[in-house]
């Protein structure tokens, strides 16, 4: 029985990176992250840089916890052990609704770009956005129930397709980039305040939220003590490079006098191309890359990850035991996958990207505050824990990170706060009922989950080579993007 309730380790570092980045690169980048270009113009690079910087240290904290405790469930497990079960439940509960919201928002974004793709070809689809979005969620529910190997292979395929299309689109857009746009600041920038800049950083930070996604699948990652820290070291820099590159093209192709229109656009990239008069094949290519690459990669990952949290919480007695059921053939938490997928479909019915984004952002910030606090408490309560990776300066870095994230929470609208509080209250009620019902049951034996795996010398050498290649490529991407923003100032 225990064997059935332990998930299968099949992911390597590459899958850990692509699933993590795939969860992040999508709805935020193509909606709120691009909307901020309309608020800040070329100064958007500063907000994106700040968003990356405030993600790096928390990412290192998660690298430490993920390597030491490679469970399915991530922050839920870390907070349960470090702070206490109720905080673990709140962390897991908010992580779940955050990514369920991302799934819903991503499905709606897919629907728009899917229809834009056909519209650019002269074909108008007589189907509503909500119907298309719901259907694509159902497709990914099936692929995720079928097995984690399929999930990983699909994720790699989606990410590489996205980047293949993105590179071609970048090359096609280069002749349309107007360098003076980066030097001229829009008139409305003068009205910006420190609080409005913090609000912009918060919106762009949503593009980074989820940088620790691979921790939630720690029980399915091979050699997690090595692969989880490596994936988390790379993730914030990859997300920065991706967001900054796409923002650069938005700034470059849209006339500076009309760039403010992007702030309220539901699909900023399509709006930007239409404003710049760039139609035909480039628009078809953009829609294909976003819909079948960026959106698909995020949908695949955001449907795959939350069920691992619910699975672990159920296995631990914090949620109804039915969610701990593992498929006898595919060894996946199929009940959790199906239920959360249907919850995503329910949110899609709201057809409101603003509501979905606000709910997700509240949940993101709240569970990160809990997770960062857990890293501090784990150091104090469990000093004996074997830590293959250790974050430096935790006594300074963790409190500063908590303060920053709490400040960002003050920029959320009241509706998001109220919705998030109601969701937390509901979770606490379910938790109390389950703890009362299962209080006499023994905890699952997870000793096999946290047992360290040692790769052979040959395999370790191969893993080191892969990480080195990824590190070089990511470093080059970050440098290239930063140089791209500096060049317009150098050439006058």
Set out the residue ranges of the language-model regions.
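Helix-loop-helix connectors at the membrane interface of multi-pass transporters/channels
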Residues: 1, 80, 107-131, 165, ...
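Hydrophobic, membrane-embedded alpha-helices of multi-pass small-molecule transporters
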Residues: 11-30, 136-139, 188-246, 250, ...
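Hydrophobic transmembrane alpha-helices that form the core helical bundles
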Residues: 35-39, 47, 56-137, 141-145, ...
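TM-loop-TM module centered on a large, flexible mid-protein loop between adjacent transmembrane helices
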Residues: 77-78, 84, 116-121, 187, ...
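Membrane-interface loop-to-helix entry segments
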Residues: 114, 128-179, 191-192, 232-237, ...
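Hydrophobic alpha-helical segments and their helix-loop junctions in multi-pass secondary transporters
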Residues: 160-188, 247-254, 368, 372-385, ...
């Amino acid at each position: 029985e225990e064997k059935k309730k332990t998930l299968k380790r099949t992911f390597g570092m590459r899958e850990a990176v692509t699933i993590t980045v795939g969860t992040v690169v999508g709805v935020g980048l193509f909606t709120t992250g691009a909307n901020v270009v309309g608020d800040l113009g070329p100064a958007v690079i500063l907000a994106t840089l700040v968003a990356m910087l405030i993600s790096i240290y928390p990412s290192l904290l998660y690298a430490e916890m993920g390597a030491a405790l490679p469970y399915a469930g991530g922050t839920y497990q870390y907070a349960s052990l470090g702070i206490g079960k109720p905080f673990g439940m709140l962390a897991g509960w908010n992580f779940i609704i955050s990514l369920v919201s991302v799934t819903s928002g991503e499905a709606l974004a897919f629907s728009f770009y899917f229809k834009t793709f056909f519209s650019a070809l002269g074909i108008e689809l007589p189907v509503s956005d909500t119907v298309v979005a719901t259907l694509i969620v159902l497709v990914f529910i099936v692929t995720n129930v079928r097995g984690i190997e399929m999930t990983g292979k699909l994720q790699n395929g989606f990410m590489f397709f996205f980047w293949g299309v993105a590179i071609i689109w970048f090359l096609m857009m280069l002749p349309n980039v107007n360098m003076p746009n980066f030097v001229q600041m829009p008139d409305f920038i003068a009205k910006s305040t420190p609080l409005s800049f913090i609000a912009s950083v918060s919106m762009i930070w949503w593009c980074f939220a989820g940088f620790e996604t691979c921790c939630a699948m720690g029980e399915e990652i091979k050699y997690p003590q090595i692969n989880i820290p490596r994936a988390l070291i790379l993730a914030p820099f990859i997300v920065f490079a991706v967001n900054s590159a796409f923002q650069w093209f938005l700034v470059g192709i849209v006339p500076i006098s009309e760039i403010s229109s992007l702030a309220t656009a539901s699909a900023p990239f399509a709006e930007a191309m239409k404003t710049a008069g760039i139609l035909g094949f480039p628009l078809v290519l953009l829609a294909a890359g976003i819909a079948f690459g960026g959106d698909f990669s995020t949908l695949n990952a955001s449907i795959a990850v939350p069920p691992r949290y619910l699975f672990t919480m159920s296995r631990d007695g914090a949620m109804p035991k039915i969610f701990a059921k593992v498929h006898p053939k595919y060894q996946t938490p199929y009940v959790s996958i199906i239920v959360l997928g249907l919850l995503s479909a329910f949110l899609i019915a709201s057809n409101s990207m603003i509501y979905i984004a606000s709910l997700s952002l509240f949940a993101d910030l709240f569970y990160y505050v809990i997770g960062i606090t857990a890293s501090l408490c784990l150091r104090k309560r469990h000093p004996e824990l074997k830590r293959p990776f250790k974050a430096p300066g935790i006594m300074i870095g963790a409190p500063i990170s908590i303060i920053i994230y709490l400040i960002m929470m003050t920029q959320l609208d009241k509706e998001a706060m109220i919705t998030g509080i109601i969701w937390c209250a509901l979770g606490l009620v379910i938790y109390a009922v389950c703890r009362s019902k299962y209080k006499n049951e023994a905890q699952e034996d997870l000793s096999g989950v946290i047992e360290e795996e040692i790769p052979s010398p040959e395999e370790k050498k191969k893993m080191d080579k892969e990480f080195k290649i990824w590190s070089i490529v990511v470093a080059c991407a970050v440098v290239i993007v930063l140089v791209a923003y500096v060049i317009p100032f150098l050439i006058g």
